[in-house]
Regions:
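Phosphate-binding loop of NTP-binding sites
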Residues: 2-5, 22-28, 45-46, 58-62, ...
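Adenine nucleotide phosphate-binding catalytic loops in nucleotide-utilizing enzymes
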Residues: 3-5, 9, 44, 70, ...
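N-terminal beta-loop-helix "entrance" segment that forms/cooperates
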Residues: 33-49, 145
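Active-site beta-alpha connecting loops in nucleotide-dependent enzymes
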Residues: 4-19, 29-35, 287, 323-324, ...
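Short acidic/histidine-rich motifs immediately flanking catalytic phosphotransfer sites
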Residues: 62-66, 446-447
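Short Gly/Ser/Thr- and charged-rich N-terminal loops/segments
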Residues: 303-312, 426-447
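Short acidic low-complexity segments
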Residues: 50-62, 412-415, 419
Length: 467
């Protein structure tokens, strides 16, 4: 008997690729296409998928049973056009995932920020408790073999529920964990009222008798659901829980303690013991592109650093692309490295986001001693140049607001290594930045810390910095 065939358009995306792996695990014949090769497409080939680069009608096998497309794919994509002409069912990634949520006891992790890490730790807690969940998440976990998917034999499906284009309205969960609500995806929602309305509508998808685990510390969440009877609240003000987590958590940042508090409350609701929860939290060392330690950058030009025996800077990679996320990551790194100079390399993601949140972006880099801003990453089909709303304007605005802080525009990311070799030796100079850290004598400074941030192709730059 022939295998069932499924074809994914935009298979290299972090969400779509996880669903492709689900169908591979179910022994379907999986094919897909993407605009360019990437680590994700190469890994999918190793996992058993047939991946074709560029979109064209010939990519689609006429015997395909189902076509699933990424939200980033336009309706006139040649593979979609051919599938419809042949009468092959065509659905979006959220619609496909939505069908899966009906087959499991689904736990949906939502929120403007922190979804991936919270989904990851929730999954590991359930695994630690022996509940063997199936997991679809927007990051990669070492515990899942460096993948964004896990097939379990238990009744639970734990998913990351993205709000973009109202994706989460396709899902039918037994439980919702909501970390926060912020001014994000305004290209779709238009304004903050629209964002809040989207989350409110999502709550209506909760199964009868279901529960919502919500962050009381987030005022939009608190105000939106203050009279909802289905809610279990969590908060950093719950010192008993937050202190337990703070004692065992391995990754820095109050936002992570908050998110893990939500996972703690959720797990307790499902009868998981405190012992298993804390064991999972204590063993979690982070996930892909979430303040991920990547290696070290060798400092060539600093005589002072060589004298002090500090030849290398630590390099982190982070997905932050919204002001709230940038501030949270920089604060967490400052908490982890209180005596280290902190250098941030940031690639803005979408000119529309930069325009709408320009003031907030200007105020996001306060914790960094030096900031390098790269050109905007434009998202195909979702973005256009918006004149004065660009990286150069952001640099000027930051320089005006924080005149003592060193902020630069780096037009060509290929020059990043050279820029770092020039800038890192300036640490220890009284004029470097307003931070008290960089005013220490250089022999009392910790090793410099570099964090490379953004949701675009900046991820491909980080390896070039490593030894």
């Amino acid at each position: 008997m022939d295998k069932q065939r499924i074809h994914f358009i935009g298979i290299g995306g972090i969400g779509v690729s996880s669903l492709a792996r689900y169908f591979l695990a179910q022994n379907w014949a999986v094919s897909g296409s993407d605009a360019s090769k990437s680590n994700e497409t190469r890994e999918l080939v190793r996992d058993g998928a047939k991946v074709l680069i560029t979109h064209k009608p010939s990519n689609l096998n006429p015997k395909t049973n189902l076509v699933v497309f990424s939200q980033a794919i336009p309706a006139d994509n040649p593979e979609i056009v051919k599938a419809k002409r042949l009468g092959i069912p065509v659905i979006s990634y959220p619609e496909a995932l939505g069908e899966l949520t009906k087959q499991y006891r689904t736990i949906a992790i939502s929120g403007s920020h922190g979804k991936s890490t919270t989904t990851a730790i929730t999954s590991l807690i359930f695994r630690q408790a022996g509940l063997d969940p199936t997991v679809i998440v927007g990051t990669k976990l070492k515990e899942f073999g460096g993948r964004n998917f896990r097939l379990g034999k238990g009744p639970y499906l734990i998913i990351e529920a993205d709000e973009y284009k109202d994706s989460f309205l396709n899902y039918h969960p037994e439980a919702i964990l909501m970390t926060n609500i912020d001014r994000e995806h305004l290209d779709h929602y238009k304004n903050f009222a629209g964002v809040k309305r989207g989350f409110k509508n999502f709550s209506k998808n909760l199964d009868k008798g279901g529960v919502m685990i919500l962050n009381r510390d987030d005022s939009p969440v608190r105000n939106l659901f203050k009279s909802d009877k289905r809610v279990i609240w969590y908060s950093l003000k719950d010192k008993k829980t937050s202190n337990l987590i703070s004692k065992v958590i391995k990754i820095p940042g109050r936002h992570n303690v908050s998110n893990f508090s939500g996972a703690f409350k959720l797990a307790r609701h499902f009868g998981i013991s405190q012992k298993n929860i804390l064991k999972a939290i204590s063993s979690f060392k982070g996930s892909w592109r979430r303040m991920e330690y990547r290696g070290q950058f060798k400092i060539q030009n600093s005589h002072a650093y060589r004298q002090a025996g500090k030849f290398k800077a630590k390099v982190y990679d982070d997905y932050a692309h919204h002001p709230t996320e940038i501030k949270a990551t920089l604060s967490a790194l400052r908490e982890a490295y209180p005596t280290s100079p902190l250098l941030c390399v940031f690639q803005p993601h979408q000119s529309k986001r930069l325009k709408v949140l320009f003031k907030e972006f200007t105020e996001s880099f306060k914790e960094a001693d030096i900031t390098l801003i790269l050109p905007i990453y434009f998202v195909a089909g979702r973005d256009v140049e918006l004149g004065k709303w660009n990286s150069e304007a952001l640099v000027k605005a930051i320089q005006k607001k924080y005149p003592k802080q060193k902020t630069f525009y780096l037009k060509d990311p290929k020059n990043l290594r050279n820029a770092l070799q020039i800038l890192i030796p300036t640490f220890g100079d009284e004029s470097c930045a307003p931070s008290s850290v960089v005013k220490r004598p250089i022999n009392r400074l910790g090793k410099p810390v570099i964090v490379v941030m953004g949701a675009g192709d900046v991820v491909n730059i980080t390896p070039s910095l490593l030894e």
